């Protein structure tokens, strides 16, 4: 070991640039290549990773291993370069027992409440930072268009503007408002914008498949949210798994160099996703060996290489054989060291803080925030007047369904025992989670009986016939197959329903059907769930007692006829008369059961709105609202193209009336002359019901005639507006003319002169929007 105490790179009074230059000059090639590697700590052999491989970063580090890793750096390495420790803290610190698990990212988007999303990011950072983890691989900025894709739950939905608003907010929360290059407070963590870019544009929903994306399509929809957080200072970017135009994103010069580093002047750190470099050799087969893969990855601008152990030998060979100039290694390592100096890790490795762990993780304040977000993350999509339900002594509530009392499935993916780590086999503490059954038992008044029946199973697990391990050595999970029908479970649920005044049926999906490698060919409910719903709907028709269906799932699913009517060219809605109300709760987190029970019992007003469109049938996909204008006809020969529920939809327990929109600042000339101008639109909004409620007023812009094909309308602003019964407010929106853009055939974003529509209202559906126009010269 060398005494490094007096060396310049150890001197906190020197500028970071001088410290980096000094340290870089002392490092061997092996040490520099090691700094570019982030490896999986679950192997347990920390000495091999840190001492032999010289790794600069680790992930998936258990609570027991984290302090030991830091000690190994300090006592067994030559230069004592601190580790940067990352983990998947996707909607809370997923893999720390007792941490606050919020609704999924898609659930948070359902709130249409950026302030709450920022608060969730802040709370997550406060908890994560106590544990010695410095960096979360969040948020996901992918656009969810094909809902068969397994990672829809990790997104903020289908609209680029909404994604940008939510991503910007959560990044500010994680980083405590710090921008790229600025020091991070003790209770802040680095954010990571992923998966750059176009990863979600799959073939048939299949995860990590080739993305059929032109530069124009990328510029039009997929890049704007990333551009926003890049310019606002998101500390790191993660690169997607997929290929575009035959080039894996990891090696895509146009995206990494021309756009991100070039046009956007991004100075942060780039990290590959899991084994991207290795996959180019063993799966995509676009690189002959690890030396060529490592050389091309570094040349493309990658800094940290996630979980590709052979990058170490490959990069060293590439330098020594002339495939790669060592100066490019130096540039990448300089950016990694800058990140570590920014975090102050050389002076304070940010070890786990036991006192803060006790007081911050799962704190009362964070649990209250979690409940507030859960309340806003539920979208009521159908209600014939049965809700809110008045529970009282002598009444009976049947709570049925396989997810009504499943605490861990309620949390969704990236939460304890969802499959990513091995130290939480039981998941998050049961006592911290309020299931829907728990919620009704807590809230039902004395003398009101709450009775549970499972009703159906969702999946059975079987061995994967392709073997126990993937080609990269990771264990293959068991396969999920649709569960066999269980008549006894169904009979018990039907009997429970017949004896009750209200039936709440909770259905959805499970983590084995969600996530990486877990895309689905269909969107139907699996197992005996549809049979259960149809049987319960028959009971509701016979007894006249209300049936409420709660879909608790990772993504929109195709609901049976008893919920949405019988599909066809013309939908037969008469078959949906057995279900009185339908609501969606996208993995609502630890407090989701309480929030849902509060909504059904009328203690909380539903205010969630859909961040993503619900199809009637998987064959309708894609159904996102902002599709390009122009096709022959507006329906299939055998099925409507109208979705079950559209982007922006959601009901409350009161009603709202919109006035006519006006542009209040039209110039004397009648036209807005420059892109520096701002259009101010106003509309009156009145609560015409008898309850206090919250409306999400949405503003869409449509360019009426465009030189290049474009969508009919795009979300450009929204506001949550709370109104007392009978109250009227004037809601104002400021829309910069510079935001009223299209993208031309050369992939340039432009504002064209001409007439524009301003559409304001309740949802993305034309029938829900009030219209006015303005003109740009």
Segments predicted by a language model, with ranges:
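Glycoside hydrolase catalytic-domain context in secreted enzymes
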Residues: 1-744, 752-766, 773-777
């Amino acid at each position: 070991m060398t005494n490094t105490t007096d060396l310049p790179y150890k001197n906190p009074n020197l500028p970071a640039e001088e410290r980096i230059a000094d340290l870089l000059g002392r490092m061997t090639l092996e040490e520099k290549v090691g700094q570019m590697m982030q490896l999986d700590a679950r192997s347990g052999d920390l000495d091999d990773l840190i001492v032999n491989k010289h790794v600069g970063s680790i992930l998936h580090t258990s609570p027991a291993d984290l302090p030991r890793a830091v000690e190994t750096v300090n006592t067994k390495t030559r230069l004592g370069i601190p580790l940067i420790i990352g983990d998947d803290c996707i909607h809370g610190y997923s893999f720390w027992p007792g941490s606050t698990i919020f609704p999924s990212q898609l659930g948070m988007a359902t709130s249409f409440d950026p302030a709450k999303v920022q608060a969730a990011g802040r709370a997550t950072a406060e908890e994560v930072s106590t544990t010695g983890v410095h960096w979360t691989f969040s948020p996901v900025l992918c656009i969810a268009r094909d809902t068969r894709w397994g990672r829809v739950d990790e997104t903020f939905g289908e609209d680029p503007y909404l994604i940008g608003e939510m991503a910007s907010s959560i990044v500010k929360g994680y980083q405590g408002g710090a921008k790229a290059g600025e020091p991070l407070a003790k209770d802040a963590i680095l954010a990571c914008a992923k998966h750059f870019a176009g990863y979600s544009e799959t073939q048939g929903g299949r995860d990590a498949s080739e993305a059929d994306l032109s530069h124009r399509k990328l510029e039009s929809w997929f890049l704007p949210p990333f551009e926003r957080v890049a310019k606002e200072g998101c500390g790191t970017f993660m690169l997607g798994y997929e290929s575009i135009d035959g080039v894996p994103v990891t090696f895509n010069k146009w995206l990494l160099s021309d756009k991100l580093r070039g046009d956007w002047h991004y100075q942060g750190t780039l990290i590959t996703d899991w084994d991207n470099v290795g996959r180019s050799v063993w799966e995509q087969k676009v690189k002959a060996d690890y030396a060529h893969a490592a050389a091309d990855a570094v040349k493309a601008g990658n800094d940290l290489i996630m979980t590709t152990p052979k990058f170490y030998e490959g990069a060293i060979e590439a330098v020594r054989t002339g495939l790669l100039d060592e100066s490019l290694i130096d540039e990448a390592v300089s950016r990694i060291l800058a990140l570590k100096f920014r975090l102050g890790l050389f002076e304070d490795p940010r070890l786990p803080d036991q006192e803060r762990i006790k007081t911050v993780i799962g704190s009362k304040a964070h649990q209250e925030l979690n409940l507030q977000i859960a309340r806003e993350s539920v979208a009521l999509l159908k209600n014939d007047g049965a809700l809110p339900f008045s529970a009282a002594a002598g009444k009976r509530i049947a709570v049925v369904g396989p997810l009504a009392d499943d605490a861990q499935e309620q949390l969704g993916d990236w939460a304890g025992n969802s499959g990513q780590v091995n130290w939480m086999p039981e998941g998050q503490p049961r006592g911290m989670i309020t299931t829907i059954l728990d919620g009704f038992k807590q809230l039902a008044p004395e003398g009101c009986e709450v009775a549970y029946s499972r009703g159906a199973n969702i999946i059975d697990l079987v061995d994967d016939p392709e073997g126990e391990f993937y080609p990269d050595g990771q264990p293959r999970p068991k396969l999920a197959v649709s569960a066999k029908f269980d008549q006894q479970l169904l009979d018990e649920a039907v009997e429970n329903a017949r004896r009750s005044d209200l039936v709440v049926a909770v259905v959805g999906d499970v983590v084995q059907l969600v996530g990486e490698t877990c895309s689905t060919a269909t969107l139907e409910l699996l197992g005996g769930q549809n049979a259960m719903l149809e049987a319960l709907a028959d009971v509701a028709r016979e007894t006249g007692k209300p049936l409420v269906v709660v879909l608790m799932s990772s993504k929109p699913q195709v609901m049976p006829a008893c919920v949405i009517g019988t599909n066809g060219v013309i939908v037969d809605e008469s078959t949906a008369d057995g279900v009185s109300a339908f609501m969606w709760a996208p993995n609502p987190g630890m407090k989701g059961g309480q929030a849902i029970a509060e909504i059904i019992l009328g203690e909380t007003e539903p205010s969630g709105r859909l961040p993503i469109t619900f199809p009637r049938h998987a064959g309708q996909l894609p159904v996102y609202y902002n599709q390009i204008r122009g096709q022959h006809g507006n329906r299939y020969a055998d099925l409507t193209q109208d979705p079950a529920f559209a982007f922006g939809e959601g009901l409350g327990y009161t009603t709202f009336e919109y006035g006519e929109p006006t542009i209040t600042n039209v110039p004397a000339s009648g036209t807005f002359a420059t892109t520096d101008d701002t259009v101010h639109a106003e509309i009156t909004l009145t609560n015409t019901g008898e309850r206090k409620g919250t409306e999400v007023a949405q503003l869409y812009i449509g360019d009426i005639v465009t030189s290049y094909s474009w969508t009919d309308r795009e979300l450009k602003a929204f506001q949550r507006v709370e109104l007392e019964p009978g109250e009227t407010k004037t809601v104002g929106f400021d829309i910069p003319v510079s935001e009223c853009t299209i993208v031309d055939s050369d992939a340039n974003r432009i504002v064209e002169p001409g007439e524009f529509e301003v559409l304001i209202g309740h949802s993305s559906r034309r029938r829900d929007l009030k219209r006015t126009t303005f003109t740009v010269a």
